[in-house]
Amino acid sequence: MFKKRVVKGSRDSKRKRLADEAVASDPVLPKDTGKTAVAEAQVEVENEDKRALYLAKEREEQEQELELRRKERTVLEQEIDEDIERKAKAKVSGFVKPVSKNMKTVTITDYQPDICKDFQKTGYCGYGDSCKFLHSRDDVAGGWKLNTDWKVDETQEKEVLKELEEIPFRCFLCKKEYTSPVVTKCNHYFCSSCFMKQMKVSTNCPICGKETEGAAKMATKLRKLLKKT
């Protein structure tokens, strides 16, 4: 009985078989029609646009920040200059020094001793609160007028006092203040009711004893003097 002889393949046949297996195991790739390159180019352009917009926005924000810092620096420099100038003006020599911040100050405006004629006549002044004259609408008079009025009043007051000195300040009969005073021919003053009662007793004047005949007239002068006092 004879055995079957197995013939081994050559190296070339083995290499071919491995190549066929590799081709069979790989998937079939689609053919490139050129659209892939166009899409990639479009995506790249969009990315470039976004990058440019971002850089422009970032550059604009940086410029705005620089401008803001420049303005803040300018304002700060102005405040420093004003503070230095204010301190220089407030600095005085001698015993009087600038007032501390925790102290309360009161400002008194010393007006020129004249009255604003426009405000006195019309109630309006174009200078407003900066006017150096006093805004007042009270009745005023010049110095010479005041002195004249004072002299007149003083003279009249002296005359009244002199006349009152000559007249008793109370009724001679009732020892009280005059009520409806009357005067006799001998220039003696009494209350009307007191004089009428005395005339029932005697017609002679109670002070000097002269005959009055029971007649007396109203003392208008004394009444005016009593009203002034």
UniProtKB/Swiss-Prot annotation:
Species annotation: Kluyveromyces lactis (strain ATCC 8585 / CBS 2359 / DSM 70799 / NBRC 1267 / NRRL Y-1140 / WM37) (Yeast)
Family the entry assigns: Belongs to the CWC24 family.
Superkingdom classification of source: Eukaryota
The keyword Zinc-finger is annotated on this UniProt entry: yes
Intracellular or extracellular location(s): Nucleus
Higher taxonomy: Eukaryota, Fungi, Dikarya, Ascomycota, Saccharomycotina
Chloroplast found in the keyword field: no
Zinc fingers (C3H1-type) by residue: 110-138
Protein name: Pre-mRNA-splicing factor CWC24
Basic residues: bias regions: 1-17
Task performed by this protein: Involved in pre-mRNA splicing.
This protein's encoding gene: CWC24
